[in-house]
Regions:
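Short, low-complexity disordered leader/linker segments with a strong preference
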Residues: 1-41, 342-349
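A bilobed periplasmic-binding-protein/Venus flytrap-type ligand-binding module shared by bacterial periplasmic
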Residues: 125-135, 225-242
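Extracytoplasmic/periplasmic substrate-binding proteins
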Residues: 202-219, 223-224
Length: 349
């Protein structure tokens, strides 16, 4: 699939691991930062609707962590008619939170993208089935109907990774493009399984009273990189201190949220006006509880350091399934130069 097709398709669905959808606060919505840009001004792009999964950015902004790191932030949610990297490449944003797999696909078109920091340390994808399903492993997907939003973006790549991890071929399963109706389709028995994200789809289904089980796509068998801090190599090289400040303050906020989750809810509420009743607050807290472990990873501490081996495996996998349209060098598409713990990282840019 050509990148232009992917960009159009992801207008409402890109980086689904971040619970994205049509923007609720208007195209290119901003709510913080200075009105005129200076050397320390940084515009941080977030896709589409405000959500507690973006809380590290909200907290770093509202608590002054970005300012303390030496930058003046402007937080910008994409408009519903924007592509995932459109504003970044146009210079309207300096960094964007987006999935590493989609950045790699875009980079294969020759776009100047680089991941300067890890946002999710743990891959959030999972195969979701009814609790009563006979599917208990990825191998059990043989002969089953798997529902996904469409054959593009993170959910699609995760589906192909799940099939491979189960020792299967795509010909062994039926992949149905069902749009963003996974919950209804699974509940109605229209599909046997859906591929979604443990901190979004699975949470929403449980909140809706649907009895489900998850088969995780663990990092050892899933060669994909989820949400990352993405910029252009040109900007990072021209503004190395600002790039480090973004990664440092964002990861500092992750650790602060782990210590006091309420700070995330309070900061998100300034953006998400729906957090005004017990039901919406309960949902946000459930999503947050499922998201904090993704930020922290196995070490229970966020530091922004990325794993070059995982990026290399991902590039090889994406190439094997035919979604890369040119060469992608893992050492170019990701860099640990800007992570606060870079001196301890085993992979270098």
């Amino acid at each position: 699939m050509k990148l232009s097709t992917i960009v159009r398709a992801t207008v409402i669905g890109a980086s689904a691991s971040l619970a994205l959808g049509a923007c609720a606060v208007g195209p290119g919505a901003t709510q913080s930062g200075a009105s005129s840009r200076g050397a320390s001004d940084v515009t941080i792009g977030l896709t589409y609707i405000p959500n507690v999964q973006f809380a590290p950015v909200y907290v770093a902004d509202s608590e002054g962590l970005y300012n303390d790191a030496g930058i003046t932030p402007t937080v910008r949610h994409h408009g519903s008619d924007e592509g995932l990297f459109t504003a970044l490449l146009a210079g309207q944003e300096d960094v964007v939170i987006a999935s590493g797999d989609e950045a790699a696909v875009a980079a294969s078109q020759g776009l100047d993208l680089v991941s300067i920091g890890q946002y999710y340390a743990t891959y959030p994808g999972s195969v979701i089935v009814p609790a009563s399903s006979s599917i208990t492993s990825l191998a059990d997907l043989a002969g089953k109907n798997i529902g996904i939003p469409g054959e593009y973006g993170s959910s699609y790549y995760a589906t192909l990774a799940a099939i491979k991890a189960g020792g299967l071929q795509t010909s062994d399963v039926t992949i149905s493009s069902i749009g963003y109706t996974q919950q209804a389709a699974l509940a109605a028995g229209q599909v046997d399984a859906v591929v979604g994200f443990t901190n979004n789809d699975a949470v929403q289904m449980r909140l809706a009273g649907i009895d489900i089980r998850e088969i995780p796509l663990d990092g050892a068998s899933t060669p994909l990189v989820a949400a990352s801090i993405i910029t252009t190599r040109e900007w990072a090289q021209a503004h190395p201190d600002a790039a480090r400040a973004v990664v440092s303050a964002t990861t500092e906020a992750m650790n602060a949220i782990a210590a006091d989750p309420q700070v995330a809810i309070d900061a998100t509420a300034k953006w998400d006006t729906t957090l005004s009743d017990e039901t919406s607050l309960a949902a946000a807290n459930a999503v947050l509880a499922a998201t904090v472990p993704l930020w922290l990873g196995d070490d229970a501490h966020a530091d922004g350091v990325q794993d070059l081996a995982t990026w290399s495996s991902m590039v090889s996998f994406l190439n094997s399934i035919g979604v890369l349209e040119g060469d992608v060098d893992p050492t170019v598409i990701m860099s640990n130069e800007y992570a606060p713990a870079a001196e301890n990282a085993s992979s270098q840019s």
